[in-house]
């Protein structure tokens, strides 16, 4: 297993809780380095430092394979959290500097730029991607978070959580995730984070889970949950607002993400 800093222990506990005795488990997080390469030129950049095939046919979205970069064996996954084509590159920690420098050197020909956590957070919100610990957690289920497309009952497999999901499958969710944009489009005004109250007229109907300013679309974006009885469809064009530092800011619900690029088939 390779785990992120925030959820490594959570993921490890969950996996070990459910695997059988016949399965061997090992946490190799500290043995490997993950480098993320995202953007329209990421495929071309990798093709210039490796002889492997990075086309859509060579590595499809959500697939992975071993490749060779500058003489180093690298596990490449075609995944992206920023709404653009991208790759995650995993290699032994003692080889990671060599791969990093090879990418930086070739990146000078492709407009490569370092990317911080907040930049990634903005772009994932533009694309409607949810963040574990904020937008989704053990307190939410797929039906509440708009993730029912990720559930399938077609196969006769008793997956973890199947029984619990079947019980709520046909029930109205107790809350629903909403994507919102503020009518005030000034950067950082207000400073949106999370846990801000969501109002319908003068009544609190939910709370925000994520917030940021999109420089690409010049809009303040917020995600949040609204309580049952307030369906997303019924709240469109209603008098909604988010309260920040005792001031209410009008918001509009959007049904689709701001960035709707198809990154799967390119």
Question: Where do the protein language model's features map onto the residues?
Answer:
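Conserved, structured C-terminal
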Residues: 2-266
């Amino acid at each position: 297993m390779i785990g992120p800093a925030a959820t490594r222990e959570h993921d490890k506990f969950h996996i070990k809780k459910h695997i059988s005795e016949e399965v061997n488990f090992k946490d190799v997080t500290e043995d490997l380095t993950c480098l993320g390469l995202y953007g329209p030129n990421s495929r071309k950049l990798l093709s210039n430092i490796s002889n492997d095939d990075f086309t859509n046919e060579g590595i499809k979205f959500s697939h992975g394979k071993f490749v060779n970069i500058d003489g180093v064996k690298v596990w490449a996954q075609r995944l992206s959290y920023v709404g653009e084509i991208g790759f995650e590159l995993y290699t032994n920690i003692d080889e990671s500097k060599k791969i990093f420098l090879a990418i930086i050197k070739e990146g000078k020909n492709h407009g490569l730029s370092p990317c911080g956590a907040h930049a990634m957070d903005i772009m994932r919100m533009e694309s409607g991607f949810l963040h574990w610990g904020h937008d989704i957690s053990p307190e939410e289920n797929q039906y509440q978070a708009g993730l029912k497309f990720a559930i399938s009952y077609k196969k006769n497999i008793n997956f973890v959580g199947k029984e619990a999901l079947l019980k709520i499958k046909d029930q109205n969710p107790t809350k629903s995730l909403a994507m919102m944009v503020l009518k005030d489009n000034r950067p950082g005004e207000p400073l949106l984070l999370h846990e801000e109250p969501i109002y319908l007229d003068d009544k609190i109907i939910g709370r925000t889970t994520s917030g940021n300013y999109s420089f690409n679309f010049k809009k303040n974006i917020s995600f949040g949950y609204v309580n049952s009885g307030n369906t997303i469809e019924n709240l469109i064009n209603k008098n909604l607002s988010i309260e920040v530092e005792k001031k209410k800011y009008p918001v509009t619900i959007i049904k689709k993400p701001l960035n709707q690029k198809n990154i799967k088939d390119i």
